[in-house]
């Protein structure tokens, strides 16, 4: 995760701003600079290489002292920064909004995946500039639309029906901010269209999840799609989701946290996010993740058996 101010800076033209990507030498200069505390939140002028990010964001970049930041000297950083600027420059952003836009925290890996989709000549984003810009605006929180299958960050498709697409995320192969844990496995489920979904299509997805992914929890980050994650990583997701939710409220960022379909979401996660939306503390909400829940009447009871019998019936055909 990183603020948009880590990728670009605003330049006033007439009554609105044009956004310009940083270059790696300017960032490198900023990382070595001694800056007064009162200037830490201001864009840094490297004199030779142009404008650099505010020094308060030093920890967002990978250095000898900080291996958890972005690999900003890669080609991918330039590609992501340029793509962000293209999307922001498609909007008219004025003095009133520029600070809140640049302070927004975005998913670095999501944006790298959009670059990879853009560069894949078999992908719809390679052929449609409008859809690409729309996808980026959704990713950086400048659109109220949810991330659907067409505008998704992408990955490897492992399941699809008329209503849903399930992606295996490919963060292990990334340049900008790769996942270093080689045991990382995570999936995302997007809606093919933002419209009501039939019970039959929900049933197909639930059957797939129970049959193939019963060691994973289905959760949501509140952005209109599902995540399928290892149970061991649920607490980490909870901390991040709670922190983002509270930060958005503090920053005055209007964002609806969508709970999604309770029949699909892991029961404990649904309780956690419902409690969070009610304004409870992280400690109170977190307890719900590890609490034994009363089983709700399940409209899809026995689906795993149905799926198993259906697959057995195909043998010999």
UniProtKB/Swiss-Prot annotation:
Its EC number is 3.6.4.-. GO terms for biological process: viral genome replication. ATP binds at residues 107-109, 188, 221-223, 227. It comes from Rotavirus A (strain RVA/Human/Japan/AU-1/1982/G3P3[9]) (RV-A). Its main location: host cell. The lineage of its organism: Viruses, Riboviria, Orthornavirae, Duplornaviricota, Resentoviricetes. This is Non-structural protein 2. Residues 205-241 are annotated as: RNA-binding. Signal peptide: none annotated. Participates in replication and packaging of the viral genome. Plays a crucial role, together with NSP5, in the formation of virus factories (viroplasms), which are large inclusions in the host cytoplasm where replication intermediates are assembled and viral RNA replication takes place. Displays ssRNA binding, NTPase, RNA triphosphatase (RTPase) and ATP-independent helix-unwinding activities. The unwinding activity may prepare and organize plus-strand RNAs for packaging and replication by removing interfering secondary structures. InterPro entries: Rota_NS35_C (IPR048306), Rota_NS35_N (IPR048573), Rotavirus_NSP2 (IPR003668), Rotavirus_NSP2_C (IPR024076), Rotavirus_NSP2_N (IPR024068). The active site is at 225 (for ntpase and rtpase activities). Homooctamer. Interacts with VP1; this interaction is weak. Interacts with NSP5; this interaction leads to up-regulation of NSP5 phosphorylation and formation of viral factories. Interacts with host DCP1A, DCP1B, DDX6, EDC4 and EIF2S1/eIF2-alpha; these interactions are probably part of the sequestration of some host SGs and PBs proteins in viral factories.
């Amino acid at each position: 995760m990183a603020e948009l101010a880590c990728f670009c800076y605003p330049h006033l033209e007439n009554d609105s701003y044009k956004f310009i990507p940083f270059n790696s030498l300017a960032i490198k200069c900023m990382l070595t600079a001694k800056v007064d505390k009162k200037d830490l939140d201001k864009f840094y002028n490297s004199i030779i290489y142009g404008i650099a990010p505010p020094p308060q964001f030093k920890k967002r970049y990978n250095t000898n002292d900080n291996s958890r930041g972005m690999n900003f000297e890669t080609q991918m950083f330039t590609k992501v920064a340029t793509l962000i600027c293209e999307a922001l420059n498609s909007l008219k952003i004025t003095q009133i909004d520029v600070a809140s836009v640049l302070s927004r925290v975005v998913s670095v890996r999501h944006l790298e995946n959009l670059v990879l989709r853009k560069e894949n000549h078999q992908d719809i984003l390679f052929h449609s500039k409008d859809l690409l810009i729309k996808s980026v605006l959704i990713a950086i929180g400048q659109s109220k639309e949810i991330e659907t299958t067409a505008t998704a960050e992408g990955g490897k498709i492992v399941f699809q029906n008329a209503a849903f697409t399930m992606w295996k995320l490919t963060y292990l192969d990334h340049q900008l901010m790769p996942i270093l844990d080689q045991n990382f496995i995570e999936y995302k489920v997007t809606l093919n269209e933002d419209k009501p979904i039939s019970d039959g299509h929900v049933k197909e997805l639930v059957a797939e999840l129970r049959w193939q992914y019963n060691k994973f929890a289905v959760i949501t980050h509140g952005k209109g799609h599902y995540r399928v994650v290892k149970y061991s990583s649920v607490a980490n997701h909870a901390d991040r989701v709670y922190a983002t939710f509270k930060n958005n409220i503090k920053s005055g960022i209007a964002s609806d946290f969508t709970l999604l379909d309770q029949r699909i979401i892991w029961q404990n996660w649904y309780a956690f996010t419902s409690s969070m939306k009610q304004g409870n503390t992280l400690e109170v909400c977190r307890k719900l993740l590890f609490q034994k829940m009363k089983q709700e009447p399940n409209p899809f009871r026995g689906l795993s058996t149905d799926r198993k019998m259906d697959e057995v019936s195909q043998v010999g055909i």
